[in-house]
Amino acid sequence: MSKQILILPGDGIGPEIMAEAVKVLKRIDAQHGLGFQLVYDELGGTAYDKYGSPLADETLERARGADAVLLGAVGGPQWDTIDPALRPERGLLKIRSQLGLFANLRPALLYPQLADASTLKPEVVAGLDLLILRELTGGIYFGQPRGNRTLDNGERQAYDTLPYSESEIRRIAKAGFDMARLRGKKLCSVDKANVLASSQLWRAVVEEVAKDYPDIALSHMYVDNAAMQLVRAPKQFDVIVTDNMFGDILSDQASMLTGSIGMLPSASLDANSKGMYEPCHGSAPDIAGKGIANPLATILSVAMMLRYTFARATAADAIEHAVGKVLDQGLRTADIWSEGTTKVGTVAMGDAVVAAL
């Protein structure tokens, strides 16, 4: 029986990078006889333009029925002035929560060919390979109450709420320990337990879960220190587990250790490893339509999809090796280009990866 993948190109550079990822997916499908069925729909700004909503009900049903979802990127300035509840990003938050995608995997891996692209000294980042596991469906982005009000003195005030339940923390902590077991057996839990009540519960529950993983070395770190340590000595980390907002910030920071966010894939998984896969970068409306966007993060997201949802590690390895081969050939999109390498566009980079397969 064929496996169904829902393709959501999204906004900005999304359709351009998705076209290259789909080329790679079709080639790997043909080579390995995977039998994927691809279904297309809209999410974000393009969905708002087409359906009047950033996530249409029928799109959500297609996502529920699919085995995996592959997303480009959402957002753009043309939707900045619409009702906040209908902005592209709300569609992304809704599909994550409705599909129960609570675990966001964001690797920060430095390809040796791109060591010069990092703004840090080569000796600080050489060999970097860490994974940030971000809780994705709780915390301050979803917490209620939230809103705006006018105080008695006429001053405007805005407020948000940062709640976490024991069960939400337990399941992401367990996922963190499981990932650490597959990697270097080190887990660092990042919180702000010196100030936040939610972080105090977070730390307590992580400690409880740790009792089931005696083989994993657990450490705790405050988020401000973690941000500093990521720049000072990033190779001390193997797996970092943290809440929604801290993970959002730290994973973007970690991405630049590698030289370009255009290289980094991500996976968002439910309890059964059904997932949505997308590049870590945004929709980059400033370069949309110019044919210069880096498709490698989206292509590597396909590899993550094959690995985590479909358990096809050999096919995933083939894509990752093909990306390495293309970098060995000196091909670079503008964001990772340096003197002595060959600058290519989005389509040429996608074609090169297909050829390397």
Swiss-Prot record:
GO terms for cellular component: cytosol. InterPro entries: IsoCit/isopropylmalate_DH_CS, IsoPropMal-DH-like_dom, Isopropylmalate_DH. It is an enzyme of class 1 (oxidoreductase). NAD(+) binds at residues 76-89, 282-294. Substrate binds at R96, R106, R134, D224. Homodimer. Catalyzes the oxidation of 3-carboxy-2-hydroxy-4-methylpentanoate (3-isopropylmalate) to 3-carboxy-4-methyl-2-oxopentanoate. The product decarboxylates to 4-methyl-2 oxopentanoate. Belongs to the isocitrate and isopropylmalate dehydrogenases family. LeuB type 1 subfamily. This is 3-isopropylmalate dehydrogenase. It comes from Xanthomonas axonopodis pv. citri (strain 306). The lineage of its organism: Bacteria, Pseudomonadati, Pseudomonadota, Gammaproteobacteria, Lysobacterales. The gene is leuB.
